[in-house]
Amino acid sequence: MNPLVYIVMFGWIPFVIYLFRWVPAQRAVIISFIIAWLFLPVVKFHFSGLPDYTKMSATCYGILLATIIFDIKRFSSFQLGWLDLPMLVWCLCPLASSITNGLGLYDGLSAVLDQTVTWGLPYYLGRLYLNNLDGLRKLAIDIFIGGLIYIPLCLFELRMSPQLHRIFYGFH
């Protein structure tokens, strides 16, 4: 695997923390997720006993750490409500499925942890930082700007075939 993949993936958490230092927290969350989704490599690092380390998990871990460091009071503003119930069920579903299928508690808890990192953490961070119309407006504007930035890359790939991921990260 290309060394740039390791640099980008394991340097992402410090970058997100640095971003929180210089940009308002809400903007840092939005920028972190958009840049990660558009530009980080599609790769999974498997660590025994832990959820896979992907671009989304790296972003979530970075935002959680940055929130603990720079915006710890934000956690106290979160209140679990009825609208959060579907996500809670979605994150806990693998446990029931694993036990029902005879795979055991360990496999079920592992799947719950993976599901929570993949879906629950982004949801939770969105609820923490984007829980009002102003936050959603900023998110929509930044997604639009991210799309505009991505257009030249899409045009290049239309002409040259999907090559940018291979060029930068060494695989597709």
Task: Please report, for each region that a protein language model flagged, where it lies by residue.
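Membrane-interfacial helix-loop-helix modules of multi-pass inner-membrane proteins that assemble, modify
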Residues: 99-105, 151-172
